[in-house]
Amino acid sequence: MMHKGMLWIATAALMGSLALMTPASAQDSAMQGFTVNAGIFYPSKKSVRQASEDIWFSVDLGYKFQTSEPTESGYYYDLGVSIGYRGAGGASYIPVHLTFTGYLNEQFFYRAGAGVGFPKSGDAAFSYAIELGYNFSAGTTPIALTIGYAGIQRGDVNGFTVGLQFQF
């Protein structure tokens, strides 16, 4: 019961922080927006794969609420939040993260997220994710390929991610 209560509290806090955020005066509101990253999650522990499935479904919804000004070399970063789902069979977890995304240039970026993970069985724990990405479309709906590693502090739901990210 406490597990679901914490999920609702974390979700309410996340949504409340989004409602209260205002863009910095230097940032362009066109640079803000949502991202959806859908793909696969491959648990790193064999025991987890044997208890559920080898490959899990993975999806994240992110929102960037602040974008920095680019440096002379073109580097800039976003601050944001994300909520996701990773699961297959009877196993799953929901990560709720604050995110930092650094853009090295027009194509390459990296992302680090930290927050709370809510596994289907067990108590909530510290959750994290790191990703590398490559933008291969810069049109009206940018598309990127991402690879990374995500998990929770308990270590039973950690693994590799591969996904396609859409920005709108």
Kindly give the residue locations of the regions a language model identified.
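Short glycine/proline- and aromatic-enriched beta-strand/turn motifs that initiate or cap beta-hairpins
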Residues: 22-84, 159-167
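Ser/Thr- (and often Asn-) enriched beta-sheet segments in non-cytosolic proteins
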Residues: 35-37, 144, 151
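Generic secondary-structure microfeatures
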Residues: 40, 83-87, 102-104, 108, ...
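Solvent-exposed loop/turn segments connecting transmembrane beta-strands
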Residues: 46-55, 85-94, 116-127, 150-161
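Repeated loop/turn-to-beta-strand initiation elements of outer-membrane beta-barrel proteins
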Residues: 68-79, 107-110, 136-145
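Outer-envelope exported proteins of Gram-negative bacteria
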Residues: 80, 97, 111-113
